[in-house]
Protein backbone atom coordinates (compact mmCIF):
# COMPACT_ATOMS: atom_id res chain seq x y z
CA UNK A 1 0.00 0.00 0.00
CA UNK A 2 1.30 3.43 -0.84
CA UNK A 3 0.31 6.60 0.89
CA UNK A 4 0.26 10.09 -0.52
CA UNK A 5 1.33 13.08 1.53
CA UNK A 6 -1.48 15.22 2.92
CA UNK A 7 -0.13 18.27 1.10
CA UNK A 8 -0.41 16.52 -2.25
CA UNK A 9 -4.08 15.72 -1.70
CA UNK A 10 -4.78 19.35 -0.75
CA UNK A 11 -3.40 20.59 -4.08
CA UNK A 12 -6.13 21.29 -6.64
CA UNK A 13 -6.04 18.69 -9.39
CA UNK A 14 -7.19 21.12 -12.08
CA UNK A 15 -4.07 23.29 -11.81
CA UNK A 16 -5.75 26.33 -10.22
CA UNK A 17 -3.64 28.59 -8.07
CA UNK A 18 -4.51 28.96 -4.39
CA UNK A 19 -6.81 31.90 -3.68
CA UNK A 20 -5.06 34.48 -1.48
CA UNK A 21 -4.09 38.11 -1.71
CA UNK A 22 -0.45 38.96 -2.33
CA UNK A 23 0.73 40.99 0.66
CA UNK A 24 1.79 44.52 -0.23
CA UNK A 25 5.16 45.65 1.03
CA UNK A 26 6.66 42.19 0.84
CA UNK A 27 6.44 41.49 -2.89
CA UNK A 28 4.99 44.75 -4.13
CA UNK A 29 6.93 46.86 -4.94
CA UNK A 30 9.35 44.26 -6.32
CA UNK A 31 12.63 43.99 -4.43
CA UNK A 32 14.72 44.25 -7.62
CA UNK A 33 13.19 47.63 -8.42
CA UNK A 34 13.81 48.84 -4.86
CA UNK A 35 17.44 47.66 -4.94
CA UNK A 36 17.99 49.70 -8.12
CA UNK A 37 17.39 52.84 -6.05
CA UNK A 38 20.18 52.16 -3.51
CA UNK A 39 23.76 50.95 -3.60
CA UNK A 40 23.10 47.74 -1.63
CA UNK A 41 20.43 45.74 0.15
CA UNK A 42 21.84 46.98 3.45
CA UNK A 43 21.42 50.61 2.40
CA UNK A 44 17.82 49.84 1.37
CA UNK A 45 17.08 48.34 4.80
CA UNK A 46 18.45 51.38 6.64
CA UNK A 47 16.74 53.81 4.24
CA UNK A 48 13.33 52.12 4.58
CA UNK A 49 13.64 51.64 8.35
CA UNK A 50 14.46 55.31 8.94
CA UNK A 51 11.52 56.46 6.83
CA UNK A 52 9.19 53.95 8.50
CA UNK A 53 10.23 55.32 11.88
CA UNK A 54 9.44 58.86 10.70
CA UNK A 55 6.00 57.75 9.51
CA UNK A 56 5.35 55.96 12.80
CA UNK A 57 6.45 59.03 14.78
CA UNK A 58 4.14 61.17 12.62
CA UNK A 59 1.15 58.98 13.50
CA UNK A 60 2.10 59.00 17.20
CA UNK A 61 2.40 62.79 17.36
CA UNK A 62 -0.97 63.47 15.68
CA UNK A 63 -2.78 63.09 19.01
CA UNK A 64 -0.46 65.63 20.65
CA UNK A 65 -1.04 68.29 18.00
CA UNK A 66 2.68 68.45 17.18
CA UNK A 67 3.61 68.27 13.51
CA UNK A 68 7.37 67.74 13.59
CA UNK A 69 7.49 64.79 11.16
CA UNK A 70 6.24 64.46 7.58
CA UNK A 71 3.40 62.01 7.08
CA UNK A 72 3.04 59.47 4.28
CA UNK A 73 3.72 60.80 0.78
CA UNK A 74 1.59 58.08 -0.81
CA UNK A 75 -2.01 57.25 0.03
CA UNK A 76 -1.77 54.65 2.81
CA UNK A 77 -3.98 51.62 2.60
CA UNK A 78 -6.29 50.63 5.40
CA UNK A 79 -4.15 49.11 8.19
CA UNK A 80 -0.98 49.44 6.06
CA UNK A 81 2.24 49.25 8.07
CA UNK A 82 4.75 52.14 8.08
CA UNK A 83 7.43 49.96 6.46
CA UNK A 84 5.13 49.09 3.54
CA UNK A 85 4.36 52.79 3.09
CA UNK A 86 8.09 53.62 3.17
CA UNK A 87 8.87 50.98 0.54
CA UNK A 88 6.16 52.36 -1.75
CA UNK A 89 7.56 55.90 -1.29
CA UNK A 90 11.06 54.70 -2.18
CA UNK A 91 9.71 52.86 -5.23
CA UNK A 92 7.85 55.99 -6.38
CA UNK A 93 11.03 58.13 -6.07
CA UNK A 94 9.28 60.51 -3.67
CA UNK A 95 12.23 60.69 -1.27
CA UNK A 96 15.76 62.02 -1.53
CA UNK A 97 18.41 60.03 0.26
CA UNK A 98 22.12 60.52 0.78
CA UNK A 99 23.81 57.31 1.85
CA UNK A 100 25.88 57.53 4.98
CA UNK A 101 23.44 59.76 6.84
From Swiss-Prot:
Pfam families: RNA_pol_Rpb6 (PF01192). Keywords: DNA-directed RNA polymerase, Nucleotidyltransferase, Transcription, Transferase. GO terms for cellular component: DNA-directed RNA polymerase complex. Belongs to the RNA polymerase subunit omega family. GO terms for biological process: DNA-templated transcription. Residues 1-13 have a biased composition (Low complexity). This is DNA-directed RNA polymerase subunit omega. SUPFAM superfamilies: RPB6/omega subunit-like (SSF63562).
Amino acid sequence: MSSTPAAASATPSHGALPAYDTPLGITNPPIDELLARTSSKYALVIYAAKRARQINDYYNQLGDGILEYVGPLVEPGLQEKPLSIALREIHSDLLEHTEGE
